[in-house]
Regions:
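Helix-rich effector regions associated with P-loop NTPase G domains
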Residues: 1-4, 8-75, 100-103, 109, ...
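Amphipathic helical hotspot of TIR/SEFIR-family domains
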Residues: 56, 60-63, 85-96
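Short acidic, S/G/P-rich loop/turn micro-motifs used as interaction or catalytic elements
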Residues: 82-86, 110-113
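Conserved ATPase-coupling elements of RecA-like P-loop NTPase cores
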Residues: 87-90, 114-119, 227-230
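A short alpha->loop->secondary-structure connector
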Residues: 94-101, 189
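Canonical P-loop GTPase G-domain recognition
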Residues: 103, 111-174, 185-192, 196-197
Length: 368
């Protein structure tokens, strides 16, 4: 019998091992063969019920995949989440693709407030890429929701691939699958050939999308990045760390020794400085709560999972403890919590940002 592959994720179809990759029940397989649409059970559930089952790509598999990309003469399109650059850097990528042209794609640009200029974001992404040892040929901002942005992206890909194949790489949760779906629609008019979802680690095996000249765009599985907030939340609460709508900044006038809780996911302490406004950029649904710095830790312990959510009461058992990162700020600076959002400090201040253990907190020149 010829080998069949899931048209959702590309995994080889098998009917033996329920826990394994590409599993589908025999009855579903027969039905799929009749309709010509063979999905593994995981993709089927994802398509029809938005139900997510977790499958892990081992680090070993991922290294194999990077080797394959690095060994090919292809354009590498590296998709990152503008909202979470740190959480979307692929460790070691520059080492593997040193010989390839890399096009850096900043995704989810529609989430940034309209007041952010594209040129500023592009410049910032290029700076950050250089810090990570990458030398992209160009930076493109895009959004899977925006047709003209996808057209621009395709034009850039055509410009830089010079008749070669294209590999699309990215960590999980950067919106890569949704972007690939938009590209497929742009090229072929076929909607939803690939699974898209919000759970870390969804696309598996590489997907092939034919281009006019006999070349292919290959979509590769997302690697799970350990420093993303997304690992610590259930599917229902993932929405707080992958906003879908334009973020509305909120400014809080704080006195020194005041604290701002970011749901139960993090906290911001204004330790020392003149009274001033701090501007927050988080998902619009995330409830922020102001309190006194004194007793803030006890307040968190008492209210996390209740007044301070997410995490909810069930998730909080597994949720890592918050760890403090102190900063002395001199001028306009963004304090970024990887995968959650950022706080703009407008003047001189001594502050602390608390984030779950293992989640990166970094500073950057204010982007707005």
């Amino acid at each position: 019998m010829e080998e069949l592959f899931c048209i959702g994720c590309g995994a080889p179809i098998q009917t033996e091992n329920k826990e394994g990759l590409g599993y589908t029940p025999q009855s579903a397989l027969e039905k799929g063969l009749e309709t010509g649409e063979v999905y593994c059970q995981r993709c089927f559930r994802l398509r029809h019920y938005n139900e997510i089952t977790d499958v892990h790509l081992t680090d070993d598999d991922f290294l194999k995949l990077l080797h394959e990309v690095g060994d090919s003469d292809a354009l590498v399109v590296n998709v990152v989440d503008i909202f979470d650059f740190n959480g979307s850097v692929i460790p070691g990528l520059p080492r593997f693709v040193a010989g390839n042209d890399v096009l850096l794609v900043g995704n989810k640009k529609d989430i940034l407030p309209k007041s952010v200029k594209d040129s500023k974001v592009t410049h910032w992404l290029m700076e950050r890429a250089h810090e990570e040892g990458m030398r992209p040929v160009d930076v493109v901002l895009t959004s899977a929701q925006n047709k003209s942005a996808i057209k621009d992206l395709m034009e850039k890909i055509e410009q830089y691939r010079k008749g070669r194949d294209v590999y699309v790489v990215g960590v999980t949760n950067v919106g890569k699958s949704t972007l690939i779906n938009a590209i497929i629609q742009e090229i072929t008019g076929d909607k939803d050939i690939i699974t898209t979802s919000r759970f870390p680690g969804t696309t598996l095996d590489k997907i092939e999308i034919p281009l006019d000249d006999g070349s292919y765009i290959y979509d590769t599985p997302g690697i799970i990045h350990r420093h993303q907030m997304a690992h610590y939340l259930t599917a229902k609460n993932l929405k707080y760390v992958s906003p879908k709508k334009e973020i509305k900044p909120k400014t809080y006038q704080l006195n020194p020794e005041q604290t701002l809780f970011l749901g139960g996911l993090g906290r911001f302490d204004f330790i020392k400085g003149e009274k001033q406004g701090f501007t927050t950029f988080f998902d619009n649904e995330l409830k922020l709560h102001r309190t006194k710095l004194e007793g803030a830790t006890a307040f968190y312990d008492k209210h996390v999972g209740g007044l301070l959510t997410p995490p909810n009461s069930k998730e909080k058992e597994e949720f890592p403890p918050l760890v403090s990162h102190e900063f002395t700020i001199k001028d306009k600076t963004d304090l970024v919590i990887s995968g959650l959002g950022w706080i703009r400090v407008n003047g001189e201040a001594k502050v602390a940002v608390w984030a779950p253990e293992g989640v990166a907190v970094v500073t950057r020149k204010a982007i707005i």
